[in-house]
Every structure is written in C-alpha cells, then in structure tokens.
Amino acid sequence: MNEVEFLEYIIKSIVSNKDAVSIERVEDELWVLLTLKVDKNDMWTIIWKSGNTINSIRNIIRIFWIQLNKKINIKVLD
C-alpha cells in the first residue's frame, strides 16, 4: 500500500460521501504533495477542531517518507 492508497483509506473511513474523495500526487526532488478533495459537506470532518484531524493525518502519512529523506504535505481543497 502506498501513501495515496493509505490516505484514501483513512479519509474514506471518516467521510460520508466516499465517492467524492480524490487524491492527486505531485512529487519533485524534495517534496511530495498530496492534494485532497472531498465533498463540501465532509470538510468539517477533515478540518474539525482547528485542523486537529487533518494535522493528525498529516503526521501519520509523513511516517512513510522519513526513511526516504523527502518531505510530504497534504493540501485540502475546498
């Protein structure tokens, strides 16, 4: 399982509209950017409590990249 599949698994387990979840991956020499799109009604689930949910998810996903000496970030589009 790669980081996109893992992120998709986490997000789909907490949102209502699972079909609206999409993730785009862009990589350069230093960074990997995962752009996350969810249904407008599910945004509160992802950003809940001043971003605590998405920040926790970001920390989990970053574990994938510690050994590769790359940085990863997740951007949530509204």
Model-inferred region functions:
Residues 47-51:
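Glycine-centered tight-turn and secondary-structure capping sites
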Residues 1-45, 55-78:
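RNA-contacting regions in translation and RNA-metabolism proteins
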